[in-house]
Amino acid sequence: LKRMWFSNGIYHHYGCEKFVPDFSSDYLRMVIDHTDKSLIPLKDNETMDRFCDEIFPVMFEASVLPKRVNKADKQDLVTTSACNYYENVTQAEVEKFYNDMKDEADESMPSYGLNSKLVKRDGSIVECKWTENGMYGPAISHIIYWLEKARNEAENEQQKKVISILTEYYRTGDLRTFDRFSIEWLKETEGRVDFINGFIEVYGDPLGLKASWEGFVSYKDIEATRRAQTISDNAQWFEDNSPIDPRFKKKEVKGVIANVVCAAMLGGDEYPSSAIGINLPNADWIRARYGSKSVTIGNLTEAYDQAAMGNGFNEEFVIDASM
C-alpha cells in the first residue's frame, strides 16, 4: 500500500516498472465478494466477473503492461506503455496527428497535445481536451474555484493577472493562452509567494507530448535567494567564460531568475515524490525570448540531506553494518 501511495499507482514512480501484489488474485476476489457492491466502480451494466477479468491481469500478471512508460527501440511506444494518454491509437497515428498540426514557420508554436487525451472512435482520431467543460471537468472546476479564491489574496496586480489568464486556460483549453500565462508568470518576480499549477511535465508520456497535472505553492527564502541572485546577476559572465564551443554561447543572456524557496504545498505529480529544483517554463521559444525561473526548493533539499545522513542506529548497534 505504501508503494502504491508513493508511486501514485502500481508502477515505480521513476523507473516505471510494474510491481505486483504480494497477495493472490483469489484473496482479492474474496475481499471484493465481501465488499458492499455500491463501493465497487463498475461501469454501466458491468458484472463483477467482467470487472475482475479486466483488472486482474493488469494487477497480477507481470507480463501484462509491464511498464508505464516504455522507451525501448523498435517497439510501438504508445501501445506498449500503460499510461492513460492514448486509446486505440498507434505511435505512428499519434505522430502523424500532431505533425499535421505543426507549422514550422510559426516561431511561437504551442505545445500541441499537452492538455488532452488522444482517442480513436469509430475510425476517427479525436482529442479529448482537459477543460472545465471537457474531460476531467469536475476536478478542473474545483481548481478554477480555488484559483479565483487565491486571486483575491494575491500580493500584487501581476499575480492577479497571471491567475486570471490561468483560469481562462482551464476553461478554454487553448494552449496559446497557456503560453501567454507562462510569459506573464515569468514577469511576476516581486511577490514572496509563487506557484505552479497546470499540466506541466511530460515524463509520463513515452512520446513526450502530454503532461501530467501538478500543483506547487512556495514562498521565498529571502537570505538564500539573495545568495542565489548574486550568481544569476552574473549569468552573462558565466556564459562568456563557460568551457563550450563559442558557437553555442548566447551573446545576450535573458531573464535568468534564481530563487530559493520553501515548499508550502505539493499536489498531483509533484507529490509525494517531489523535485528539489524547478526550471520553467518548458517551451523552448518562451525560454529563448523571455527567460526562465530557476528555483531551488530549500526545505526539501534539506530534508533529503537529513534523510541521507541516517540515524546512527547501524553504527551503534550492528557489529557488521553491511549486514
Question: Model-predicted segments: where are they?
Answer:
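Contiguous, non-catalytic segments that form substrate-binding/exosite surfaces or channel walls
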Residues: 4-322
